[in-house]
Structure formats: structure tokens, C-alpha cells
Design a protein with these regions (language model features):
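Flexible "cap/lid" loop of the alpha/beta hydrolase fold
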Residues: 87, 91, 98-127
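Structural signature of beta-strand start/N-cap positions in the alpha/beta core
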Residues: 7, 33, 72-75, 96-99
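Short beta-strand/loop motif that positions the catalytic acidic residue
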Residues: 189, 195-197
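Active-site loop/oxyanion-hole signature of alpha/beta-hydrolase fold enzymes
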Residues: 35-77
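Gly/Ala-rich beta-loop-alpha elbow adjacent to hydrolase catalytic centers
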Residues: 78-82, 86
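Conserved alpha/beta-hydrolase catalytic His-Asp/Glu region
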Residues: 111-113, 130-187
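Conserved HGGG/HGGXW glycine-rich cap/lid loop of the alpha/beta-hydrolase fold
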Residues: 1-48
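Glycine-rich His-Gly loop
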Residues: 10-13, 80, 198
């Protein structure tokens, strides 16, 4: 629709896949040009990420995507790791973002979240891909939702196992998230920002 001039960018969390946002796309495309993207390193055939991969690298990737799409400004929605990508883009290239919506970010990593991350990492390293993928819903969704959506969840898990990214990439992304300290960057961001957290 040529009458829609504003662009809305969605950035996913640790999984990094654009299809995380699929349930929201139909609604938002009525009001915005929508851009969703798979983050670097999350495809089955992705090249290995560098050993010192950082959140700033994820932000640089998005800046490059925006420039390649000739986008001079956009609104931004990010979930968890994706929220921090938005913060870093706002710091690196503030002119590219107008408003930010940050879902489930944190100002510092608390013990509970760190424990969840460490357990997921241990599952992947010592038990394998299937256990890592099938445990993910337990960390992300309430029990009732899991029970009510068993079929679609199982289908998604089976697809995720088949298409799993290189394990070193998953660990590099997880470690970059665990190491990230958002407070300093957040203090420099002057954009209108809505934070939604539970």
C-alpha cells in the first residue's frame, strides 16, 4: 500500500528468526511497511560467528539492513535480545530510529535469568539439540498456553530441530546476551521508548 509510509522493524530474541513475529504481521501490515529479518548466524547453513561476537555486532547488522533497504528512519519493536539490538542501533545510528518498543529487556541480568541461560547452555552442550529445543517452551510460556497449543508447538519444535543453527553460533549469541550491560547504552538513548516487561 503506497499510502503507508512508516516502516516498523521487528527484531527477535535469542532464537533470532523473523517468523517469531508471524502472529503480529497481518495486523501491523495494515498500518506500516513491516520489516522482519533473520539475524546473522541463525540459519542451518550459516557461517560461524566470530569468537568475540557481541551485541554491538547484531546492531551493526541491522544498521546495514536498514541502509540496504534505503530506510532513513523507522519505528522499532524488539524482544529481549532484539530489544537490546534496538538500544544499540539507537546509540550507533540514532537518526535511523524514531520510536522504540522494548519487550522484556532488563537493566541488569538477574540470577533467575542467568540460571535459565546457563541451564539452556548446559542442555545444548551436554544433552544435545533436541533437549535444548524442547525445553525452550518451558522457559518462555505459561503451562496453560503450552497445553492448549501442544500440536503447533510440537510442529515448531520439530522444524527447529531439523533447521538448527550451528551450535557454536547459538552459544556465541547466548554468551553475547549474557555479557551485555544495557544500562550504559540506555542512559544515552533519547528516543521515545515504551518498555513492556513481565
Amino acid at each position: 500500500d503506497k499510502s503507508i509510509t512508516k516502516t516498523l522493524v521487528f527484531s527477535s530474541g535469542l532464537g533470532g528468526h523473523a517468523n517469531f513475529w508471524q502472529p503480529q504481521i497481518d495486523f501491523f501490515t495494515q498500518h506500516f511497511q513491516v520489516l522482519c529479518y533473520d539475524q546473522q548466524g541463525v540459519q542451518q547453513d550459516s557461517e560461524l560467528l566470530s569468537s568475540n561476537y557481541q551485541l554491538k555486532d547484531l546492531a551493526t547488522e541491522l544498521v546495514d539492513i536498514l541502509k540496504c533497504n534505503n530506510l532513513s528512519s523507522c519505528h522499532f519493536v524488539g524482544h529481549a535480545l532484539g530489544a537490546f539490538i534496538g538500544l544499540e542501533v539507537a546509540a550507533q545510528a540514532p537518526q535511523l530510529l524514531e520510536k522504540l518498543v522494548l519487550l522484556n529487556p532488563w537493566d541488569e541480568l538477574d540470577f533467575y535469568t542467568l540460571k535459565c541461560f546457563n541451564l539452556r547452555q548446559s542442555l545444548l552442550e551436554h544433552t544435545g539439540i533436541e533437549a535444548y529445543v524442547k525445553a525452550q517452551a518451558i522457559f518462555l510460556y505459561p503451562p496453560q498456553w503450552i497445553s492448549e497449543n501442544a500440536q503447533i508447538l510440537t510442529e515448531q519444535e520439530n522444524q527447529a530441530i531439523v533447521k538448527f543453527a550451528p551450535i557454536p553460533n547459538v552459544l556465541a549469541r547466548l554468551n553475547s546476551l549474557k555479557a551485555y550491560q544495557p544500562k550504559t547504552t540506555a542512559a544515552t538513548v533519547n528516543h521515545p521508548t515504551l518498555v513492556i516487561s513481565n
